[in-house]
């Protein structure tokens, strides 16, 4: 596979790259192992709260044999005003080989790439911008279900305006040949989404989609913008995947959600564990996709031989 020193955006991925990551992730899922050429160190720097992404990156790193150095922004020199650039320069000087960063600022990574590092950087989410590891694990989940992307009808529904998952997935799904549709509050369907797919109501979407991908309503970002209040019950009735709507989905269709799930808001609580739900499979796949991403950047550094990431 083509290796990269840094993985920050789905814009880096050709279709061939995507399939290489999916195949390598499947190999790890089936028990593949790799050998590091020397002791290798990772640090996960999360400036936003996270359960799935943070934990699965650490699980991926440990499964690959890396030593994970803990980092807590609340007890770091960031609280003294140290910049993100200087923080990363510091950990590189100390000997860290891989930094995985989540940050609330869109494209936080650009000044870091411009500065240049020998260590690798993986973007674990930037503001409302990009979330490449989530996008790849979603591609893996869809590929495991259908075996292809071409012509699949996939609805992305919910808080589009604030979602890095929506932006990453709409670009990658369209590139791979899927047909993307959008749903949710119409005011969140902006011009940047119009180029990728049309808007439909929930009742229109559930009748024809192969995948219903629900997005969390991001209360924390809504309140930051304009102190909006939110009526969860009204949202669920108008834009949520209710049990009645789920019953009208095609028999082969699946439900996805990047989580955390607001049960009873984006979808009815019972649907989270329903037979057509792939939500927990997405979480499982997250470990193996992140193993593939970490292995790729380490192979670029020569810390894993290139032959070990070929499948």
UniProtKB/Swiss-Prot annotation:
Pfam family, one: OTCace
SUPFAM superfamilies: Aspartate/ornithine carbamoyltransferase (SSF53671)
Single Gene Ontology MF annotation: amino acid binding
EC number from the UniProt entry: 2.1.3.2
Enzymatic class: transferase
GO CC annotation terms, alphabetical: cytosol
Catalytic activity line of the entry: carbamoyl phosphate + L-aspartate = N-carbamoyl-L-aspartate + phosphate + H(+)
Pathway this chain belongs to: Pyrimidine metabolism; UMP biosynthesis via de novo pathway; (S)-dihydroorotate from bicarbonate: step 2/3
InterPro entries, per the entry: Asp/Orn_carbamoyltranf_P-bd, Asp/Orn_carbamoylTrfase, Asp/Orn_carbamoylTrfase_sf, Asp_carbamoyltransf, Asp_carbamoyltransf_Asp/Orn-bd
Entry-linked PROSITE patterns: CARBAMOYLTRANSFERASE (PS00097)
UniProt: carbamoyl phosphate binding residues: 52-53, 102, 131, 134, 259-260
Binding site for L-aspartate: 80, 164, 216
Gene Ontology biological process: 'de novo' pyrimidine nucleobase biosynthetic process; 'de novo' UMP biosynthetic process; amino acid metabolic process
Gene3D superfamilies: Aspartate/ornithine carbamoyltransferase
Keywords carried by this UniProt record: Pyrimidine biosynthesis, Transferase
Family membership: Belongs to the aspartate/ornithine carbamoyltransferase superfamily. ATCase family.
Subunit note: Heterododecamer (2C3:3R2) of six catalytic PyrB chains organized as two trimers (C3), and six regulatory PyrI chains organized as three dimers (R2).
Function in brief: Catalyzes the condensation of carbamoyl phosphate and aspartate to form carbamoyl aspartate and inorganic phosphate, the committed step in the de novo pyrimidine nucleotide biosynthesis pathway.
Record NCBIfam families: asp_carb_tr, PRK00856.1
Protein name (Swiss-Prot/TrEMBL): Aspartate carbamoyltransferase catalytic subunit
Organism: Lactiplantibacillus plantarum (strain ATCC BAA-793 / NCIMB 8826 / WCFS1)
Gene it is expressed from: pyrB
